[in-house]
Regions:
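Short, surface-exposed patches at the edges or C-terminal ends of soluble domains, predominantly
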Residues: 2-531
Length: 531
């Protein structure tokens, strides 16, 4: 009998055909599912920190504040397969893709800047920032046709241990959401740094500028002796001045302080940063005194506060600020976002001086809310000043290398119960009656440490960065605070599987099921043949 017409051969042929069909079907289904999973972001985030998942806080913030009427273009400066092969870049990619999956007005593109450098040329010109293959650019066009963009380096998306420089967390969600909100605003509010007072253009100013930039400000510098503040200015920053501000007199027509007064009258905000080495500047300090801010001095020497029990350094001068717990106070309201965390972050004040009672202000205890504050009222002007951070009760004041005695502290007004311990940061609010039953406000925030904004202090290990964004949100009329938590790694090692190992696992997981089916088919065919 011809073997081709035998019953065994027919059964074997059917089994083999069925096996081949099943294998082909498995491969086809796998290819289709892979394509759909990539398009629709079907994946399970198995990291303990949910690195690849957008938090509910980020989704809620975007839902409330993101302008969906503007087209946003996110540019990765490398091809997608290269991004997927890098653990760090893959985190950034998945964050952006998950956001883009929620909003149709976000387009994501991949550009090889080495073969197509012109694709990012305009961004380089606009931002004056270096752009490389690891850069991520978020861009949109405002109502005036002007480009608004934010350029992120890969390093800026991660948090590092300040002592070991090891990666400890992923902060891309905060960076990207902030950028999306910033570039889609109809008009960016301006933050101006004052110049021409001996300010040293050091790294601390650069880091503070970056915080304001990320928060949504167009950051500029201004010489108030020669220029007026732009109409869109919402914040003026006075940072570590070494010479005085000019006030109008018979020999001088320039009046910087009059410009600041008018600016604050228009319901805007000022930040001032001083320290233990800030010289006596009579004009500026008269202005600050009017706003409840007075630098504490002993015999014309600024105090330097040593808080050994709450210091990050053995010298005792890198002080951890104590949160204000007085209910109902503006200082407590400003830090509520930090204190509401399960483990509130430390806010650090390196090399800090202190503030004392300002002339003309009266200390008040709001018995209903238990909040201590200072109040001022004269000629229709009403201001209240609140501490935001203080030292511990054990802190010491040093002047000229010597610890001050109690009698010396009393002589400079540092025994008032409302300001003990020493004040590191204060916020003053001026109240404006709009005449229609509503109120509006002007603000001045003063910090007694210029190192408050140094790189290590703004690391997401501490709360300095978030505190500044909360302050911008409270004081700025046109600024949305973005203070999403960093995702800290359970291990400081970002990934322990290489790209080649991942490829091997993929091949194994794809081939093993298909091979098993093939082998089973062969076994069945042989058994039936010899049955």
């Amino acid at each position: 009998m011809n073997i081709l017409h035998s019953k065994k051969f027919k059964h074997g042929s059917i089994s083999l055909a069925l096996t081949v069909t099943i294998i082909a079907a498995v491969i086809l289904v796998n290819a289709i599912f892979t394509a759909l999973a990539e398009k629709n972001l079907w994946y399970i985030d198995m990291t303990s920190e949910d690195i690849y998942s957008l938090t509910d806080a980020a989704k809620d913030l975007l839902a409330e504040e993101f302008n969906t009427n503007k087209e946003v273009l996110v540019t990765f400066c490398a091809e997608k397969d290269i991004l997927e092969a890098s653990a760090e870049q893959r985190m950034a990619l998945h964050t952006i893709l998950e956001i883009a999956n929620l909003y149709d007005n976000i387009t994501v593109r991949y550009v090889d800047i080495y073969t197509n450098p012109s694709a990012v040329h305009d961004y380089k010109i606009h931002t004056t920032q270096a752009i490389n293959s690891q850069s991520i650019i978020v861009a949109a066009t405002n109502k005036n046709g002007k480009m608004e963009c934010r350029v992120h380096s890969l390093k800026s998306l991660f948090s590092f241990d300040s002592s070991t420089s090891e990666v400890i967390g992923y902060n891309g969600e905060q960076r990207f959401v902030s950028s999306l909100l910033a570039v889609t605003q109809d008009e960016l509010p301006i933050a101006c740094f004052t110049t021409n007072h001996g300010e040293i253009d050091n790294e601390n100013i650069s880091y503070l500028s970056n915080v304001l930039y990320e928060t949504g400000y167009d950051v500029q510098q201004i010489d108030l002796t020669k220029e007026d503040l732009p109409a869109a200015t919402r914040l003026v920053v006075i940072y570590d001045p070494q010479s005085d501000f000019k006030a109008s007199n018979a020999l001088n027509e320039a009046d910087e302080l009059a410009k600041l007064d008018a600016f604050l009258d228009a319901r805007n905000a000022v930040m001032a940063f001083v320290d233990d080495e800030t010289p006596y500047l009579p004009n500026l300090e008269d202005f600050l005194n009017e706003w409840g801010i007075k630098i504490a001095r002993h015999e014309d020497i600024n105090l330097l506060i040593r808080d050994s029990d709450y210091s990050l350094s053995t010298s005792g001068y890198t002080n951890v600020g104590q949160y204000i717990t007085d209910e109902g106070g503006l200082g407590q309201s400003l830090t509520a976002g930090l204190t509401s965390m399960k483990y509130p972050k430390s806010v650090v004040f390196p090399k800090t001086t202190a503030f004392t009672a300002a002339d003309g202000y009266e200390s008040v205890n709001d018995e209903e809310n238990s909040a201590w504050f200072y109040t001022y009222y004269s000629n229709g002007v009403s201001r209240n000043t609140y501490d935001v951070f203080r030292s511990s009760a054990q802190a010491e004041a040093i002047a000229g290398g010597q610890k001050l005695r109690t009698s010396e502290l009393e002589a400079i007004g540092l025994q008032d119960p409302s300001i003990l311990p020493f004040s590191y940061m204060r916020i003053t609010r001026e109240n404006h009656d709009n005449g229609d039953g509503t109120m509006s406000y002007s603000y001045l925030l003063a910090c007694a440490s210029t190192d408050f904004t140094r790189s290590a202090a703004l690391n997401s290990t501490y709360g300095n960065h978030q505190l500044l964004t909360y302050a911008c949100s409270m004081m700025g009329r046109d600024v949305v605070s973005v203070s999403l938590s960093c995702k800290y790694f359970a291990s400081t090692e970002i990934a322990n599987i290489t790209a080649s190992e991942a490829s091997q696992y993929t091949v194994v997981l794809t081939a093993v099921p298909a091979s098993a089916i093939f082998i089973v088919g062969i076994v069945i065919m042989i058994r039936r043949r010899y049955a």
